[in-house]
A protein has these predicted regions:
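Short, flexible, basic/aromatic active-site loop/helix in glycosyltransferases
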Residues: 184-188, 199-225, 229-241, 466-485, ...
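Conserved donor NDP-sugar-binding/catalytic core segment of glycosyltransferases
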Residues: 150, 164-204, 440, 445-470
Length: 616
């Protein structure tokens, strides 16, 4: 045995003892039975009560309830509090069907239906907020708050019946913010959202420079604001939450009798700061309608929210526990509705077909000509020649194969219109978004056109107005229609049999230019006179809807922007790429702002144009 300093003898330790002392099991896995214990379990998910108030909400409920089902919070830790009253539709039946189906999945369900009466005595219509309606809603919210407190819920989340919570993590994300009152910023088709950045001394909305940067997410985070509404979370664990109330109004309250303002005042008096978070896309809500609006307006407004969701997100999934209403598609009074789509653009095709389905529009899917797949021999076999002297106005390049394919796609539809003798047809491309009340507004316009006996060949439904120096001429006695000046884009248009014959009669394949340059030539509004000399007569009777009913889904520079026409190759030389303009394309930039003098202010307006309230 080796010697050690000081003459001490080295001790020999058995290996099993070293293992026990230095590296053996310990703690929860103690060596002796009495030393073992189980690790601590994680905390349970907080208890949340979700409060839903619904009135005449039948069109929205399948989607709204489906979104609530997909919230990633344990259902056994979630209670439902649902109230409905003053209905003229089947809101009560839908909610009852849903609650019966899900009551075994959630911690508890409280159901407060009232079948009668169907209206308030002081209301002017179903969308009018009278004092008695405000008071009733405040009492219901207070009842939900009391139920949450009585069951010792940690949180209560209020959700309006037409708010779509598309982000399933919304609830957990709001809880993580650790705020007494916090709302997820909801998106809409306009600047409207579920928060205010400013409030006057009388409690009314006040415009502030802070609002738009938050609404557009130029600034991201959670922001202190004087008002949140529609969908928001209250942390009932916070001591200050005990002083919050929806009803009755605070004794010092003298502002307008409005449920959201009353609650904002309650928060102010309790020294509870409201917050809105815009870190992610949480969901969507409709822009409020005017008091005179109908339930049909409301149903179509919510359907438009679903269309807007689909522009950049998957379609809204409906509840799996209730039967979805059936839809009956039609052609809107047209002989045919065409929808052009490249076979390789499956995502666009599926989105457009779903959007048309939601609006109950029947269409014939037309496979677009893929110019990029055409070789020189195929082009020559069709007798295609480029218009002498044509150059793209922004880049000086010739026609691209993508533009060639786009032209042929429309050209083939014009041929079909003539061959089938279709008197009036509607043509859609696949990269567009619909304005609110699209179907009803276009059908109303076409009735006006027919009533007045207007001689027309083509009507733009979506376009980019290029002549911005002076207004276009309004059409007398026809609402929402102007005589079209120089325009870009063929997003959507109505074409007559006579118009299709005129376009084919111009023999455009032998002197081709982009289709949205060809059309202005044919109605004699193209600014380049040299192009017009190759076509005669130029007597296409072209008009445009005003305001427009169709816009692009994406503009140059937007996330997800893809062009199959500009990012291609030159039509007769596959070696010359045109992909340089993907980020700088002027053609697909958003319509520039028009001066007051250039706006089409003389056009007759439809009542549907003003159905929605001011966006803020």
């Amino acid at each position: 045995m080796a010697a050690v300093p000081g003459g001490a003898r080295a001790l020999w330790w058995p290996p099993w003892l070293l293992l026990l002392l230095l590296g053996g099991p310990r703690g929860a896995d103690g060596y002796f039975p009495e030393e073992r214990w189980s690790p601590e379990s994680p905390l349970q998910a907080p208890r949340v009560l979700i409060a839903l108030l619904a009135r005449n909400a039948a069109p929205a409920l399948p989607a709204t309830l489906g979104a609530l089902e997909r919230l990633r919070h344990p259902r056994e830790r979630t209670a439902l509090w649902v109230a409905t009253d003053h209905n003229t539709d089947n809101t009560s039946a839908i909610l009852r069907e849903w609650l019966v189906a899900v009551k075994g999945l959630y911690h508890s369900v409280e159901w407060r239906p009232a079948e009668e009466p169907s209206s308030y005595p002081d209301e002017e219509g179903p969308k009018h907020w009278s004092d008695s309606r405000y008071e009733h809603v405040m009492k219901l919210r207070q009842a939900a708050l009391k139920s949450a407190r009585d069951m010792w819920a940690d949180y209560i989340m209020f959700v309006d019946s037409d708010n779509l919570i598309t982000n399933p993590d919304t609830l957990s994300l709001l809880i993580a913010e650790n705020k007494t009152v916090v709302a997820p910023m909801l998106d809409s088709r306009a600047a409207y959202s579920n928060f205010w950045c400013g409030m006057t001394s009388q409690g009314y909305y006040k415009r502030t420079p802070a609002y738009i940067p938050i609404r557009r997410r130029d600034r991201r985070g959670c922001f202190a604001v004087p008002m949140v509404h529609s969908t928001f979370l209250i942390d009932l664990r916070k001591a200050a939450s005990r002083n919050l109330a929806f009803y009755p109004p605070h004794p010092d309250y003298t502002w307008s009798f409005d449920d959201i303002i009353v609650f904002a005042f309650s928060c102010k008096q309790a020294e509870v700061q409201m917050y809105v978070c815009n870190k992610e896309v949480y969901g969507f809500l409709p822009v409020p309608l005017r008091a005179h609006s109908s339930l049909q307006d409301e149903a179509e407004s919510f359907m438009h929210v679903q269309l807007e969701v689909m522009v950049k997100h998957p379609p809204v999934q409906l509840s799996q526990f209730i039967s979805a209403p059936s839809k009956t598609a039609d052609k809107m009074g047209f002989d045919e509705v065409f929808m052009i789509n490249l076979k390789r653009r499956r995502d666009r095709r599926e989105r457009m077909l779903q959007a048309l389905h939601e609006q109950e529009i029947d269409c014939r899917l037309v496979e677009a000509v893929d110019g990029k797949a055409m070789n020189t021999s195929q082009v020559e076999a069709l007798g295609i020649q480029m218009l002498p002297g044509y150059r793209d106005p922004y880049h000086g390049r010739p026609l691209t194969k993508g533009e060639l394919g786009c032209f042929l796609s429309h050209y083939n539809i014009w041929k079909e219109v003539v061959e089938r003798g279709l008197q009036k047809s509607l043509v859609f491309e696949d990269d567009l978004r619909f304005e609110i009340f699209f179907k009803r507004r276009l059908m109303s316009l076409m009735r006006d056109v027919e009533r007045e006996g207007l001689d027309w060949d083509l009507i733009y439904v979506g376009r980019k107005r290029m002549q911005v120096e002076h207004p276009e001429k309004a059409v007398p006695r026809v609402r929402n229609l102007v005589e079209a000046d120089y325009s870009y884009w063929t997003l959507a248009y109505v074409i007559s049999l006579q118009g299709a014959r005129k376009l084919l009669g111009a023999k455009p394949l032998a002197k081709m230019l982009p289709v949205d340059e060809f059309l202005p030539v044919m109605f004699d509004k193209h600014p380049v006179s040299e192009y017009k000399t190759h076509f005669s007569p130029r007597n296409l009777r072209a008009f445009s809807v005003e305001p427009l009913l169709i816009y692009p889904t994406h503009y140059t520079g937007d996330d997800g922007y893809v062009s199959d026409t500009e990012t291609s190759v030159v039509w007769n030389n596959e070696q010359v790429k045109t992909d340089w303009d993907r980020a700088k394309s002027q053609k697909m930039r958003e319509q520039q702002a028009l001066s007051r003098e250039a706006k089409n202010s003389d056009v007759l307006q439809s009542p549907l144009d003003s159905a929605a309230r001011d966006e803020l």
